């Protein structure tokens, strides 16, 4: 074998080995590239999924805050309506003496007090403007077996009476102011039931 043949053979083997190395290198580069692309795609998909989850959480949080705010505003409006109702009742009670139904109301308050205090001497105290009405009512009520006396002691009230059993000084205050306070809780519950019906 000649030197030239040996050199050619070495050259061919070297070139074959270079081609093999380059082919392996190309495969490795392709695999590395494919692996890198897969990692990038996985990272992208993961980030998109995280972003969508964050968006859903933000939307849910905002919806929750909006619901809470809406309920708060509705509650405030209803509470304001309730306040207005009580203001109107209070205004009505301040002018009750001028109403056509007041004589019946005053007599009903005297009768209720007399029935609760029982058959004994009872002093009836009224506002000075109500003395004539009270005297007429007392006259009618005494015909039913009661012993009511119109007291000289005046009371300052928008309407109604204070009755006192003389024997033991037990007092029933049926003035509109005290009755309003007594009935206020009951009225709040009733009005709330109407205004807040169906609220959770």
Curated annotation (Swiss-Prot):
GO molecular function term, any single one: ATP binding
Gene Ontology cellular-component annotations: plasma membrane; proton-transporting two-sector ATPase complex, catalytic domain
InterPro entries linked to this entry: ATPase_E_C (IPR038495), ATPase_V1_Esu (IPR002842)
SUPFAM superfamilies: V-type ATPase subunit E-like
Biological processes annotated in GO: proton motive force-driven plasma membrane ATP synthesis
Domain of life where this protein originates: Archaea
Gene3D superfamilies: ATP synthase, E subunit, C-terminal
Coiled-coil segments: none
Pfam families: vATP-synt_E
Record text on subunit structure and interactions: Has multiple subunits with at least A(3), B(3), C, D, E, F, H, I and proteolipid K(x).
Function: Component of the A-type ATP synthase that produces ATP from ADP in the presence of a proton gradient across the membrane.
Name the UniProt record assigns to this protein: A-type ATP synthase subunit E 3
Annotated source species: Methanospirillum hungatei JF-1 (strain ATCC 27890 / DSM 864 / NBRC 100397 / JF-1)
């Amino acid at each position: 074998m000649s030197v030239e043949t040996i050199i050619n053979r070495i050259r061919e083997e070297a070139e074959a080995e270079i081609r093999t190395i380059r082919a392996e290198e190309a495969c490795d580069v392709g695999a590395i590239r494919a692996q890198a692309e897969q990692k990038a795609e996985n990272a992208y998909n993961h980030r998109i999924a995280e972003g969508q989850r964050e968006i859903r959480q933000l939307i849910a949080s905002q919806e929750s805050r909006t619901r809470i705010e809406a309920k708060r505003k509705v509650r405030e409006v209803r509470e304001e309506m309730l306040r207005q109702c009580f203001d109107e009742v209070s205004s009505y009670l301040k002018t009750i003496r001028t109403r056509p139904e007041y004589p019946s109301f005053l007599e009903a308050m005297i009768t209720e007090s007399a029935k609760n205090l029982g058959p004994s001497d009872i002093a009836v105290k009224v506002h000075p403007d109500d003395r004539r009405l009270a005297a007429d009512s007392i006259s009618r009520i005494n015909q039913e077996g009661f012993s009511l006396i119109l007291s000289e002691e005046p009371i300052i009230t928008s309407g109604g009476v204070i009755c006192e059993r003389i024997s033991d000084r037990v007092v029933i205050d049926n003035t509109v102011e005290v009755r309003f306070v007594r009935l206020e809780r009951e009225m709040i519950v009733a009005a709330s039931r109407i205004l807040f019906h169906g609220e959770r």
